[in-house]
Each structure stands twice: as C-alpha cells, then as structure tokens.
C-alpha cells in the first residue's frame, strides 16, 4: 500500500500534479483530507492553467451581459424628432386630421416630410419641425394659385399646423422657443433746424408780406388797386346745353357683358374675373384654397348631385372659367368615374346647325373634346 502511494506521489511530482489534486482523486497517502473550498483556493494559487480557465469562464459570462446592457442604454438614448414623434402617436394624428374633415396616410406623411417639402427650398428639415415660420412657408407653396399649387398636400400641412398651433401634451416639449419681441425704435429727438448757408444751392427767400392798399378803401368807388387786388374772374364760356339727362357710367363688368350681347359674332374668351386694382376685372385662375374649400364644404356628387350641380353652376356664373379651369374644377370635385359620366352626357347635348343635339362625331369633338 505504501509502495502504491509512493508511486503515485512520484508520478504526480513528475507530471506536475499538485497534492490537492491527489486528495481529490482519493490519494489517501497525501495527507489528511481537505474541504472543497480549501482545495479550490489552493488550485487557484498554485495552478496557472486553472486561473486561465476560471478567467475565461467569467469573461464568457460578463461579455454578453455587458453587451446587452450597452445595447439597452443606446436604444434608450435614441434621438426623437418631430417626424418620429408623430409616427409614434399616429392614431392621435389621424384623429386630429379627421376632426378637421380630412384624411392623412402614414406613407405619404413620411414622403412629404422627408422629400417633397424639403425640395421646396423654404427651410423645411428632413426630420420635420413644429416651427410656425417653416410651416407657413410650406403652406404658401401648397396654396399657390394655378398649376404651382399642390391641392393633394393641403390635408397634411393643415394637420401639421394644427399640431403646432394647438399642441397636445406630447408635442409641447418639442415646440421651438418663442421669439423675443422686437423692440420698437426709439423716436429721435428733433434737431433744431439751422439756417441754410450752403454755397451750392441758392437760398429761397421768404415771400414778402402783402403791401397795404395805395388807395383809401371806398366801397362806392368802382376803381380797384391793381397792385394789391386780384383781377375779377372772367366769365367762363358757356357750352352747348346737354341734349338729355346724363346716365351714370356703367361698371366695367356691365360694359363687358353689354358688349358681348351687342356683338355676339365677335370671338370672345371667358375668363375667371375678379376685381383687381382700380376695380378693373382681371383673370384669376382657381387657387388651391378655393378648390379645397369647395370640396370640403360640399357633399360628394354621389351623395347629393343637386347640391354639387348648383355649386358648379354658381361658379360658372361668378368666375367665368376657361376650359382648362373647368377641367381643373371637375378633377377636384368629382371622382374619375363621375367625371367621365358627366363628359359623356355633355357630349350628347352638343347642338347642331338646327339647334338640336347632333350626332356628327366631328362636330361633337370640335365643340366638346374629351381631352
């Protein structure tokens, strides 16, 4: 027994095995048994390989934990922009638009904020903003009259402006600080006027006071003082008496309508008329705000065709639109199917030479083209 123990001790010594390891494997000859903690500390202090193994195990546990904690911290510090804020509260944004009678879609909301409004070159940032100055600049571009306007973007910019002017609780922290009021310029104290002594320009002398009359005042005398009195007024020339009572001049719009009735054969062009400077009628195309107001304050043609028909008739009378204006008006107020039905019905009513609806295609296409 002692020989086996001595052989084990010699083998352990040759292969660098510590006595503690011999105790763990049951070598009774190595001395009295020790506790597991004592053996562990002994292995830690005496075996370099054991220390490396333990350090690797600890590192393999700590590295994933630290990575997870760092990722959580980075995600918690994500920068919030006005655009991302509206997307996080999209249900409230849609409810705000619905209360204004319009509909907005998330995909177009993102496209307008990141691309369309940025390319207007009015200072709109890609991440969006609640600044009323930037919103007003974009709104001015959208509501521009004629082909430069963007009626399809009106619901989106009005919803943006509503969030900025009447902000909910989640928008208030992101509102820009109000601008300080501009101080009014202080009035300058008037400087006493100095006498003109310039040698470049002659000084205008003050007018002399009127001279007293040379002759004594005599009311009964027919003579006048030619030096002080003004000559008597000469009687004005009497023109021929008016031949009849004068009628007030007609307004420009009435004159235009009268000329069109008196000269029906002359070629005329109907233009949307509005009063411009000096109360003169001028051509004004439909603005985006006009089309938006007409569409939002009137029912669709499918629901109430009579109301929309009356609206279009009143617009034709008051604005006298061109053919292109009529196409723009129908495109804004009607759907594609409704617009096609209206055009087909109108082509059936094209009058011929006898005043009745004609069936000749060339006359119909010339009078009422589809495009």
Swiss-Prot record:
User: Primary place of residence?
Assistant: host cell
Q: Which domain of life is it from?
A: Viruses
Which spans are transmembrane here? 52-72
Checking InterPro entries in the record gives: G_retro_matrix (IPR000840), G_retro_matrix_sf (IPR036946), Gag_p12 (IPR002079), Gag_P30 (IPR003036), Retrov_capsid_N (IPR008919), Retroviral_Gag-Pol_poly (IPR050462), Retrovr_matrix (IPR010999)
Q: Which Pfam families match?
A: Gag_MA (PF01140), Gag_p12 (PF01141), Gag_p30 (PF02093)
Q: Where is the composition biased (Low complexity)?
A: 194-203
Q: Which UniProt keywords apply?
A: Glycoprotein, Host cell membrane, Host membrane, Membrane, Transmembrane, Transmembrane helix
Describe its membrane topology: Single-pass membrane protein
**Does the keyword Transmembrane belong to this entry?**
yes
Annotated Pro residues bias: 174-193, 204-220, 230-245
Keyword Membrane (UniProt): yes
Glycosylated residue positions: 134
- Its recorded name reads Glyco-Gag protein
> What is the species of this protein?
Feline sarcoma virus (strain Snyder-Theilen)
């Amino acid at each position: 027994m002692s020989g086996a123990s001595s052989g084990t001790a010699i083998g352990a010594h040759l292969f660098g095995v510590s006595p503690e390891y011999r105790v763990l494997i049951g070598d009774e000859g190595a001395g009295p048994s020790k506790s597991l903690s004592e053996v562990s500390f002994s292995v830690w202090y005496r075996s370099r390989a054991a220390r490396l193994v333990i350090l690797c195990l600890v590192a393999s546990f700590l590295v994933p934990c630290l990575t997870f904690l760092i990722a959580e911290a980075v995600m918690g510090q994500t920068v919030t922009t006005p655009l991302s804020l509206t997307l996080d509260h999209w249900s409230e944004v849609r409810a705000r638009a619905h209360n204004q009678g319009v509909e907005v879609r998330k995909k177009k909301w993102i496209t307008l904020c990141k691309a369309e409004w940025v390319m207007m070159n009015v200072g709109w940032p890609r991440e969006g903003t609640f600044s009323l100055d930037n919103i007003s600049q974009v709104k001015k571009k959208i509501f521009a009259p004629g082909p430069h306007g963007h009626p399809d973007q009106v619901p989106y910019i009005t919803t943006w402006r509503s969030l900025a002017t009447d902000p909910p609780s989640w928008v208030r922290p992101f509102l820009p600080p109000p601008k300080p009021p501009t101080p009014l310029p202080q009035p300058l104290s008037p400087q006493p006027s100095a006498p003109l002594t310039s040698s470049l320009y002659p000084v205008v002398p003050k007018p002399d006071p009127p001279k007293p009359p040379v002759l004594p005042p005599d009311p009964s005398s027919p003579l006048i003082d030619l030096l002080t009195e003004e000559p008597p007024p000469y009687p004005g020339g009497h023109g021929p008496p008016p031949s009849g009572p004068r009628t007030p001049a007609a307004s420009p719009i009435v004159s235009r309508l009268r000329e069109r009735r008196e000269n029906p054969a002359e070629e005329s062009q109907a233009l949307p008329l509005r009063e411009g400077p000096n109360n003169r009628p001028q051509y004004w195309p439909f603005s985006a705000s006009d089309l938006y107001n007409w569409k939002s304050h009137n029912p669709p043609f499918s629901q109430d065709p009579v109301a929309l028909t009356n609206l279009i008739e009143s617009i034709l009378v008051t604005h006298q639109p061109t053919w292109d204006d009529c196409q723009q008006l129908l495109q804004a107020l009607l759907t594609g199917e409704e617009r096609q039905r209206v055009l087909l019905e109108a082509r059936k009513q094209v009058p011929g030479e006898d005043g009745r609806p004609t069936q000749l295609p060339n006359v119909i296409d010339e009078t009422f083209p589809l495009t």
